UniProtKB/Swiss-Prot annotation:
Keyword Membrane in annotation: yes
UniProt membrane topology term: Multi-pass membrane protein
Organism this protein belongs to: Polaromonas naphthalenivorans (strain CJ2)
UniProt name for this protein: C4-dicarboxylate transport protein 1
GO biological process: L-aspartate transmembrane transport
Gene Ontology CC entries for this record: plasma membrane
Localization per record: Cell inner membrane
Function: Responsible for the transport of dicarboxylates such as succinate, fumarate, and malate from the periplasm across the membrane.
HAMAP family, A to Z: C4_dicarb_transport (MF_01300)
One GO molecular-function entry: malate:proton symporter activity
Family: Belongs to the dicarboxylate/amino acid:cation symporter (DAACS) (TC 2.A.23) family.
TM regions (residue ranges): 18-38, 51-71, 83-103, 151-171, 191-211, 229-249, 304-324, 337-357, 359-379
PROSITE patterns registered for this protein in UniProt: NA_DICARBOXYL_SYMP_1, NA_DICARBOXYL_SYMP_2
């Protein structure tokens, strides 16, 4: 394997990891000591997330088009997509089951003795109103954009992915005649990633604003009011990450702990912003740096943001059973299995919908009919603090899924993977945008003519 000469590490103060840690600590301090000022910092976090979101659609489009158009065997695209969906279904089912088992073991809602009739349901009306849950048919139809530009304007990931797949297939059919378009799209992707590199420079500001707002608005005290559920949920996420995902990673030849260290900067940004989308472009590039082929990365990561929400799956089963425990609503084994079965369907049907956690939970509780929907009011206040664990688990789960599916399809360079996880490719691991210019000089210009 050919490796580049080792590069000098950045000084600690210039490390994005260090900057985000300091920003999060400063945000917590500001929100705690000056709550009103902390609340006013919300635009900083919102602005950073919007900056990243504006780049997601074009990056996914360029990455997937280049990956598909440059492939010699089109059957691999279908195989990759099929294996990814199979993996998503199996692992997210494991997440639901683990959440169900551990919430029964920890019993976080036992002893609260809440009368559901006394709960104020006004606060959850926005999540439980008619038409909030998207049907399977509507979900499938929503994947098809009304216009080509509309998908990009609205930032609909699955719609952009569909357009990219179709465009990539069509460009592949052109063979050598499409080389000019292929080269233009590929070079555009490098420009887009360079822009993401610029945006990431302000990630500490975004993390600071989001954390200051959260602590300022909700207060540290609200962390303790329903701390037992939060503690059980965070512990369950850790068990899932190091137990289930750790075992999957080990079977496929890499360490989940080393992988977490590799994406530590992205995890900190997600911790600050509570949005796994805030690092989607950077995660795609980092997966490529680990040796996963562009096609696999472009298909698995965007799809995983809709179908592989492991942290959300754990949250759904734990929250539903917690409400039952808190309101003294007995649930038989059959009723819990029914709850699990309904969640297998509803957790996919609301993918990509704002507030999907509450919407899915409300729809599921209504469908099962055993647990009072009014109990959602119990967890509304701490949901914001559990969103970090959901987003972090989702991010790690999608990263592991990408590497696993890439290995299944022989699209993973294991030597490059081990080098990246062992910090042998330090520059690419920690500052991927710094090597974009070097990569631009080695773009596969002949890929299109070979495909033809």
């Amino acid at each position: 394997m050919t490796t580049s000469a080792p590069t000098e590490k950045l000084p600690l103060y210039r490390s994005l990891y260090f900057q985000v840690v300091c920003a999060v600590i400063a945000g917590v301090a500001l929100g705690y000591f000056y709550p009103s000022v902390g609340e006013s910092m919300k635009p900083l976090g919102d602005g950073f997330i919007k900056l990243i979101k504006m780049m997601i659609a074009p990056i996914i489009f360029c990455t997937v088009v280049v990956g598909i158009a440059g492939m010699e065997d089109m059957k691999k695209v279908g195989k990759t997509g099929g294996l990814a969906l199979l993996y998503f279904e199996v692992v997210s089912t494991f997440a639901l089951i683990i959440g169900l088992l551990l919430v029964n073991l920890f019993q976080p809602g036992a002893g609260m003795n809440i009368d559901a009739a006394t709960l104020d349901t006004k606060s959850i009306a926005a999540y439980t109103g008619p038409g909030k849950m998207v049907s399977t048919t509507d979900f499938i139809l929503n994947v098809i954009p009304t216009a080509f530009v509309d998908a990009f304007a609205k930032g609909e990931i699955l719609q952009v992915l569909l357009l990219a797949i179709l465009f990539g297939f069509a460009l592949h059919r052109f063979g050598g005649r499409g080389t000019l378009v292929f080269d233009m799209i590929e070079k555009s992707s490098h420009v887009l990633f360079t822009i993401v590199g610029f945006i990431m420079k302000v990630a500490p500001i975004g993390a600071f604003g989001a954390m200051a707002f959260t602590i300022g608005k909700y207060g540290v005290g609200s962390l303790f009011s329903l701390g037992k559920l939060m503690g059980a949920f965070y512990l369950t996420c850790l068990i899932f990450i190091f137990g289930v995902l750790g075992a999957i990673a080990r079977i496929h030849g890499f360490s989940v702990w080393k992988f977490i260290k590799y994406i530590k900067e992205e995890l900190l940004i997600v911790l600050g912003t509570s949005s796994s989308e805030s690092v989607l472009p950077r995660m795609m590039e980092k997966m490529e740096n680990l040796g996963a082929k562009k096609t696999t990365v472009g298909l698995v990561i965007p799809t995983g943001y809709s179908f592989n929400l492991d942290g959300t799956s754990i949250y759904l089963t734990m929250a539903a059973v917690f409400i039952a425990q808190a309101t003294n609503t007995p649930m038989t084994l059959m009723q819990e299995i029914t709850l699990l079965g309904v969640l297998l369907l509803t957790s996919k049907g609301a993918a990509g919908v704002t507030g999907s956690g509450f919407i899915v939970l409300a729809a599921t509780l209504s469908a099962v009919g055993t647990v009072p929907v009014a109990g959602l009011a119990l967890i509304l206040g701490i949901d914001r603090f559990m969103s970090e664990a959901r987003a972090l688990t989702n991010l790690i789960g999608n990263g592991v899924a990408t590497l696993v599916v890439a290995k299944w399809t022989n699209e993973l360079d294991m030597e490059r993977l081990q080098a990246g996880l062992n910090n042998e490719t330090w520059e690419e691991a920690q500052e991927p945008e710094r090597v974009l210019d070097k990569k631009t000089e080695h773009m596969p210009v002949s890929a299109m003519s070979d495909a033809g």
